[in-house]
Amino acid sequence: MGSANCSKICGNKYENELNNHDTDETKPNINYIVINNKDSLNFKNYNNFAQKFESKLPQFGKYLDIYDFKQKIPENANNYMIQNFLNIPGSIPINKNTYEMKPIQFENGNIYSGNWNENLKMDGLGQYYIEEGNLFVEGIWNNGKLIYGRIFYANDNIYEGEIKNSTYHGKGKLLFNNGEIYEGDFRDGEIIGNGTFTFSDGTVYEGEIDKGKFKGHGKMRWISGIQYEGEFVGAILSNYGTLTDENGEKYEGNFYNNYFNGKGIYTYKDGTFYEGEFEFGLMHGKGIYNKKDEFIFEGDWANNMPHGFGKITFKDFIIKGVWRNGVNVEISEFEKGDEKNFDKKYLNFEVEAFNLIPHMLPNLEKIDNDIKGYGVGTTPTYLNSIE
């Protein structure tokens, strides 16, 4: 954290007072940097705290030169802190009646540089280096407990957010070394609640998450322009949802295991649509196919083809019959129009292939594998103060 400038923290009124007090009673101890409570600046209390602190110091550590502490800050943490200020939400309590000390190195090799309260607990803004694992923390402590901060891991992952009982808890952000980002809710060290995942290929998920898995309602956007909004089970599109692309094609209905399955409506970009039953991504069951400005077929379907009994409606004709694999094999009735004036070749047709194929969406399997490792995010217990 470095030495603080008293004119910035205490105000110019006290700058000369700190520099010119010569008596032993009032001259600040050289191991102090600044008292943070400018409204009750009292050098006697200042030195009383110094004496109490230094009488306890041998029990848990020793002073360390600020330069030596700076040498311990990992390069990834130092670079990130230079480029990004620590933004502390207004809801995070910060005790201003604290004292900023020189860095303290504990017996286990860990180092803390920052503020302490009258009870000799870490309190306020501080930085913490953990020897084991080369872990570095910058954050806010409250009476000895880390409650908000940034944790820099040796593998270049970074967490920034709220912390409770030494775990991610509340609002936070995880930046992974592969460029992926999660921002949202955490509970007891796990990704639980609502949040946003941004994957390295540009795919974005927003919605409900349970222990690192998409679970419940959410939205996903691919860089191709395809979007899905609906229910998820992991990275699987499940139950009810809507899938669209940038060209205007759209499916709205039921999904199962990344397939259209159950009842739904598929609309092509020209306005043609199929409304009815689907099975594993295909028109299968009862349904209506409305070929824009040409005809409407209502009846039985199998594997994206008319198959079974059906009725086809043209502008001047309505015909009932039987189809097999898309081919009319029997005409049972002309409800409208004269059979002599109708060319039967129009009874045989193929439907246009879907451009939206959910089980072939890019990186669904990769996304599922990626998020499996994002469930547990417990921070080390020794981030807390030495009692």
Label each residue range with its predicted role.
Residues 1-387:
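Intrinsically disordered, low-complexity repeat tracts enriched in Gly/Pro/Ser/Thr and acidic residues
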